[in-house]
């Protein structure tokens, strides 16, 4: 402990010396010089601060960081070949600002709104739409570029399991995606390829992987903030057709420039293209989906603005394994599951009305009325598994967010929100009788591994939160402490989340060296009804994580940047399926028996907050930004080393434990005796690397490449089978159930096996045809160019017994096998028109 205190004291002393050795009141403005007549940034423009006689130069987009000794009035002299131009500005504190070098005369009654919120540098990675819209391997989806950022592990696969990302070791379901600060249920459609947001609506994407700001919530993983276009100068549109979907986009200003409307949408037909190719087994109907986004903005004046949003997405997927009556799995890939039925549906609608009031440059208040309607449906019929469930967790909320510039050094963000939750969950709920069973058998009729229970839950609850963040900047030193509190009324439980970010910038080191650190407590409560009093646990708490991290960012030249950051996350109170959690007396979960038997003893709560885990690692990002309007190359190299461990803390009966306990004794032991073992999380990947390259060859062609490398995920090895005790009653096919080690002292127990490493190369070639009305973009995208047979764990064929050839490595999506057995890379061909 003394050593820790000594190191901490030394660290504080170093920070103190660094802080007081630099100018206290220096101010840095992030400026973009923009020519409104040409609607382009002033690239490579030399700017002199007249008072200090210092020179600066903009990049290819007109961006530049300019330093001032203190707050005050300054003159910027723009040095052009046609002669100098002077622009006077008022400097009060560090901020981001747009400077118009030449203004286009606004239409009568037109209003120009400027400004952008300054964001933290710690644990945040920003990508611009221009850099990612044509990235290979993303199938034209800008959101898929998140997979290449440091700290992010892609969820390799195809289908619903591939529509999440792992951020610094967190469960892929624990992230929050926000569209202009509005919730969306899921970011990617069930095909695992396309996002629910149209590309042309995206302005920037920010990934907060560490201790995110207090205005965000409900994530123990990462927060992905999608900022959409905030201005439309002229009528424009886009139309794109590919092998599996069609997208459209249109935007136009109205009311003499006072407002604008932007609309985007997507329709998927993968089931009608790839699904009709004969490359898939009979009975599989690939995902169908659609989405739409509407944004309407109107400025009444410089002080008042209203915005209306409506976001929708709908997905469904189904499998109906044919019952051919043939007991030959070599001819029918789904014979083991013949007669089985499975379907899943996802949808959401987010409708919002937002009013922004800006009475002065020092204060802004935003009120948002939100109606959020997420729906999930599933229907399964397979052996002993018979269930159909519909879940809806709608809420109506009012949110307030304000920003107050108290002084030139102090800004305060604060806000509150109240939601009225209305949940509806009915049907038949399916759960594992033993959630620690790694290989449940759907045809086990002697002692079924699955349990079904009727579900009919309706109710309401209040939810409220409040937050505040103080942004203090004294010269090159920044400190942002914040705190947030969330409370769910139905569980009478809340979560307090303090957090802070600290940074210091050395502007004289190349083009700027910033050292930063961050830490804090974050919380999340799943959008489910696991807290209901009839079949769930009404005492569930928020899932929590404590995040800490630190590193540095170094800029050199106008376009290069290197960023290195280390982190550690500690997860606790994770909600898990718990067959031993119970109350002495509770309502009978079967409502049909309420008249005859309303109360039952030892009523199972089914869920608890016993899950724990932790992750640690470091990230490296080397980046070269693009130069708009130039043919220079751009790209980045990212690398992440990490480890993630998880423990459900659910009691297990191991091999060799033959002592006979009564049910009550077993329940008491399970409550107080934790004998589960911590092991690597199933989504852990030690090494993740990405190399991204883009080059605009000339006005007609652009070439892009992407190489990805990932360590294989850990998995538990199959050590045998159950002898084929059960069979599928639909066709008599014997079902060989895999068997895993249940002895924690053997090498085969737990997630100890890894397969071959994953890597692939993707390329994309774009051809542009320019016309007076716009342009057409033809593109060819090839995934897995060198036909790497990547695997993800192993696959056990239940139609055959355990042997040297069963199980085999599980192939991942990335190649196509033609009927003649020829293997080709997966590819996408499409056309996009912009007008």
Regions flagged by a language model, labelled:
Residues 323, 375, 427-436, 504-549, ...:
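Surface-exposed extracellular loop regions of Gram-negative outer-membrane beta-barrel proteins
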Residues 193-195, 203-213, 222-252, 263-265, ...:
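Short strand-turn segments of transmembrane beta-barrel domains in outer membranes
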Residues 244-267, 281-320, 342-367, 406-410:
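Transmembrane beta-barrel wall of Gram-negative outer-membrane proteins
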Residues 93-95, 117-212, 223, 229:
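Periplasmic N-terminal accessory/gating domains of Gram-negative outer-membrane beta-barrel systems
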Residues 311, 393, 403-411, 417, ...:
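Structural signature of Gram-negative outer-membrane beta-barrels, strongest in the C-terminal barrel
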Residues 52-63:
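Short, acidic Ser/Thr/Gly-rich low-complexity loop/linker segments typical of extracellular
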Residues 708-741, 755-760, 767-835:
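C-terminal beta-signal and adjacent terminal beta-strands/loops
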């Amino acid at each position: 402990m003394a050593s820790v205190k000594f190191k901490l004291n030394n660290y504080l002393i170093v920070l103190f010396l660094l802080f007081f050795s630099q100018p206290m009141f220096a101010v840095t403005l992030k400026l973009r010089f923009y020519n409104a007549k040409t609607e382009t940034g002033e690239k490579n423009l030399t700017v002199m601060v007249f008072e200090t006689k210092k020179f600066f130069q903009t990049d290819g987009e007109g961006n530049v960081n300019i330093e001032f000794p203190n707050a005050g009035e300054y003159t910027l002299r723009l040095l052009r070949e046609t002669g100098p131009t002077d622009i006077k500005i008022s400097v009060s504190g560090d901020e981001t600002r747009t400077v118009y070098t030449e203004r286009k005369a606004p239409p009568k009654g037109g209003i120009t709104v400027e400004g952008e919120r300054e964001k933290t540098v710690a644990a945040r990675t920003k990508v611009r739409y221009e850099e990612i819209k044509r990235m290979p391997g993303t199938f034209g989806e800008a959101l898929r570029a998140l997979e290449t950022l440091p700290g992010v592990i892609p969820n390799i696969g195809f289908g619903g399991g591939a529509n999440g990302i792992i951020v610094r070791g967190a469960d892929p379901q624990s992230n929050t995606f926000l569209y202009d600060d509005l919730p969306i249920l899921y970011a990617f459609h069930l095909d695992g390829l396309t996002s629910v947001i149209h590309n042309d609506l995206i302005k920037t994407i920010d990934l907060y992987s560490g201790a995110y700001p207090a205005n965000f919530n409900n994530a123990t993983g990462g927060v992905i903030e999608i900022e959409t276009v905030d201005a439309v100068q002229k009528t424009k549109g886009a139309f794109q057709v590919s092998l599996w979907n069609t997208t459209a986009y249109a935007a136009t200003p109205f009311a003499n420039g006072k407002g604008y409307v932007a609309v985007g949408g997507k329709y998927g037909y993968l089931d009608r293209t790839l699904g009709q190719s004969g490359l898939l087994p009979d009975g599989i109907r690939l995902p169908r989906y659609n989405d739409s986004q509407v944004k309407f903005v109107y400025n009444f004046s410089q002080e008042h603005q209203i915005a209306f949003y409506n976001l929708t997405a709908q997905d469904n997927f189904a499998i109906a394994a044919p019952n051919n009556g043939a007991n030959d799995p070599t001819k029918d890939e789904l014979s083991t599951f013949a007669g089985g039925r499975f379907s899943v549906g996802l949808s959401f609608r987010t409708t919002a009305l937002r009013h922004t009031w800006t009475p002065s440059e020092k204060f802004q208040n935003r009120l948002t009325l939100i109606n959020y309607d997420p729906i999930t449906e599933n229907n399964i019929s397979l052996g002993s598994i018979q269930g159909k469930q519909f879940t809806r967790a709608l809420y109506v909320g009012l949110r307030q967010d304000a920003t107050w510039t108290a002084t030139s050094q102090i800004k305060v963000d604060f806000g509150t929100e109240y939601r009225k939750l209305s949940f509806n969950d009915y049907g038949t709920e399916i759960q594992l009788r033993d959630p620690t069973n790694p290989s449940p058998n759907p045809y086990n009729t002697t002692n079924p591994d699955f349990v079904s229970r009727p579900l009919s839950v309706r109710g309401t609850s209040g939810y409220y939160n409040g937050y505040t963040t103080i942004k203090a900047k004294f010269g090159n030193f920044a400190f942002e402490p914040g705190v947030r509190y969330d409370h769910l009324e139905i569980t009478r439980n809340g979560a307090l989340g303090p957090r802070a970010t600290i940074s210091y910038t050395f502007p004289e080191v190349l083009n700027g060296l910033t050292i930063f650190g961050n830490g804090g407590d974050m919380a999340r409560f799943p959008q489910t009804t696991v807290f209901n009093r009839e079949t769930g646990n009404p005492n569930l708490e928020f899932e929590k994580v404590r995040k800490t991290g630190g590193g540095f960012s170094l800029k050199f030249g106008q376009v290069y940047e290197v960023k290195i950051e280390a982190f550690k996350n500690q997860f606790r109170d994770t909600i898990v399926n718990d067959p031993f959690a119970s109350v002495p007396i509770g309502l009978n979960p079967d409502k049909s028996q309420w008249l005859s038997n309303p109360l039952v003893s030892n009523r199972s709560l089914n869920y608890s907050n016993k899950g724990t885990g932790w992750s640690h690692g470091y990230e490296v990002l080397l980046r070269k930004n693009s130069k708009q309007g130039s043919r220079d190359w751009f790209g980045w190299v990212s690398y992440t080393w990490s480890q993630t461990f998880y423990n459900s803390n659910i009691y297990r009966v191991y091999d060799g434990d033959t002592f006979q306990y009564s049910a009550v004794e077993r329940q008491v032991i399970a409550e107080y005796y934790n004998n589960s073992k911590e092991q690597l999380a199933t989504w852990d990947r030690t090494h993740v690397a990405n190399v991204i390259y883009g080059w605009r060859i000339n006005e007609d062609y652009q070439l892009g490449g992407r190489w990805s490398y990932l360590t294989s995920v850990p998995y538990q090895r199959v050590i045998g089978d159950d002898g084929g005790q059960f069979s599928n009653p639909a066709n008599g096919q014997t079902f060989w159930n895999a068997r895993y080690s249940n002895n924690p002292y053997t090498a085969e127990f737990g997630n100890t096996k890894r397969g071959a490493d994953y890597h692939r190369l993707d390329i994309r070639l774009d051809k542009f045809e320019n016309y007076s009305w716009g342009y057409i973009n033809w593109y060819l995208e090839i995934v897995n160019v060198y036909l790497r047979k990547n695997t993800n764990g192993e696959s056990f064929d239940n139609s055959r017994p355990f042997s040297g050839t069963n199980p085999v490595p599980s192939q991942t999506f990335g190649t196509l096998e033609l009927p003649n057995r020829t293997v080709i890379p997966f590819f996408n061909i499409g056309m996009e028109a912009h007008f």
